[in-house]
């Protein structure tokens, strides 16, 4: 082949490659256009679909890739990452009693039986009074309303307590004592989940139950680490066992993990703060789907078997009604 023929052939191949890439991008955008439109029409701000770490679709109705949005109770997805980081650093185990850290509980015959695992699962029996104070002192003094391990309660008390447990363990180990700063510098920064903003209680503790602000890409990276059970770039940076437990239900509630809602059938009536149709019989959610859910339709969906992480953020925590079942049906239709 002479030089001219070679150059013409190379140019043709380059043109084909470029047009193939453009076609693939166009098809990907078109594939999820209906889901993106559904989100945007309901005050959506961001929409992101990631499969096996590869972005399949990304759309912003407001802001951009680095814009942080308040995710409300979707913040709870960071609690299992905090727990898994502490376990990986050998600062705690899931089966140790809470009383090993909160010493005042040791003398209580019921509270002394509550393990970290039971606390994180929401089955400790501890919950704040509806119109009462929600500070640390109140949380520590709470008495279980039910026998630990028997009933689930969708309440912020376990998050307040676990933040204090983390603070005490980090202080004892001479590590960064602030749980949010520890998690951010140790785990979130390496995976690209920054910048992230935290709200705090009147005691100064970071709130892991509500109030974080993060970008769509950052939240997706956190979800990807959970989906991969703590492995990042071939390194185990957070405990696989702890993150595996975070995506399993308990005897008390099969639809609740550690800060995550799980697809499946419950054995009791719904008594949850979050509004969702995820568990309707018509829902297309796969059996292994996990979801972090904030007010206003702030959502992080994880589907491990499909390798999927999906983020949907709204402009406010009071946005229009949101249907998980309808949104997921649009996603799965286009996969």
What is the predicted function of each stretch?
Residues 35-64, 300-303, 307-312:
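A short, well-structured edge-of-sheet supersecondary motif
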Residues 88-124, 171-210:
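Active-site helix/loop module of the DD-peptidase/beta-lactamase fold
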Residues 1, 18-34, 42:
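C-terminal segment of N-terminal export signals and the immediately downstream linker at the start
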Residues 53, 69-95, 119, 162-166, ...:
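Active-site SXXK
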Residues 1-14:
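N-terminal secretory signal peptides and thylakoid transit peptides that target proteins
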Residues 158-166, 210-232, 298-313:
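Active-site-proximal alpha-helical segments within enzyme catalytic domains
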Residues 194-197, 248-309:
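Active-site Gly/Thr loop motif
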Residues 54-58, 120-158, 176-197:
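Short, charged, amphipathic alpha-helices and their helix-cap/turn boundaries
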